[in-house]
Amino acid sequence: VTQEQRFEQRIAQETAIEPQDWMPDAYRKTLIRQIGQHAHSEIVGMLPEGNWITRAPTLRRKAILLAKVQDEAGHGLYLYSAAETLGCAREDIYQKMLDGQMKYSSIFNYPTLSWADIGVIGWLVDGAAIVNQVALCRTSYGPYARAMVKICKEESFHQRQGFEACMALAQGSGSQRQMLQDAINRFWWPALMMFGPNDDNSPNSARSLAWKIKRFGNDELRQRFVDNTVPQVEMLGMTVPDADLRFDEESGHYRFGEIDWHEFEDVINGRGVCNHERLAAKRKAWEDGAWVREAALVHAEKQRARQVA
């Protein structure tokens, strides 16, 4: 039995692939790309929310938002550790993101214009992320699957607090309700785009599904998100900004309109509203933090020298 056959056998038997196991080079590269993008998304995702920490309406909201952004930093670091088990260096993949050679989730290139956006990001954006990530708890690569189990627990808390913030606005004044509807109007379609291109137009999906890196296609996950979320929008007394949305009695699913794929292409190729701003902020943070990294290395070297002595 060749190594390749043994690998395929383990995938077929749903046995997790671990870092020390043999794996095809393309499998390793696909995982580095996916886990790296996922980690970058957590780190860049701190920016739109961090924008509102100093302007949160109450101390309670501020404390929740601080904790949420802190969680996202932790998720990013956790995922970089998972990527490093595949033999890449986190500095290398982080630098690729700063240089625009690696992507992060398209959703974070939209601005957060009002407090309602923060609730809607927690509810819709983290809601879409959970649909994606719950499926990844059974991904074929062990360290990634285990990271997902931990992250999903925290993400579900993020989503609940986002929905609760939206609920407070929905029960508020006319202008608060209007602010919430406006945020839903702006984030609904970008949230649907988070699942990636349609399956017949997704360059990496078929191979990722065959290797069980992904367990479901983009379209199936997007449908699941719409089915979960439309009743929540209605419960808040809000409207989904889609004239074509209707419930299909026969299939039990909601049918929804066509996504603006030109906008999606623009955003993932660096032409979104905030692409330039997000990367500039991360580059500045990387440069401003250089002294911390240098100090940590010098400290580690001193500790090592003491132990040797």
Task: Describe each model-derived feature in a short phrase.
Residues 16-36, 96-122, 139, 172-176, ...:
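Acidic/His metal-coordination segments adjacent to aromatic residues that form catalytic metal sites
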Residues 22-27, 45-67, 129-144:
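Helix-loop segments that flank and shape redox-cofactor active sites
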Residues 178-309:
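Extended, helix-rich structural scaffolds rather than catalytic motifs
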Residues 1-6, 63, 68-96, 162-167:
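Conserved alpha-helical segments that form or flank metal/cofactor-binding pockets of metalloenzymes
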Residues 1-18, 40, 92-102:
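Acidic, low-complexity proline/glycine-rich segments
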Residues 27-38, 56-75, 118, 143-155, ...:
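Alpha-helical scaffold segments that form or flank carboxylate-/histidine-based iron centers
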Residues 110-161:
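Internal, conserved structured core segments that host functional sites
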Residues 139-190:
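Glycine- and acidic-residue-rich phosphate-binding/metal-coordinating active-site segment common to enzymes
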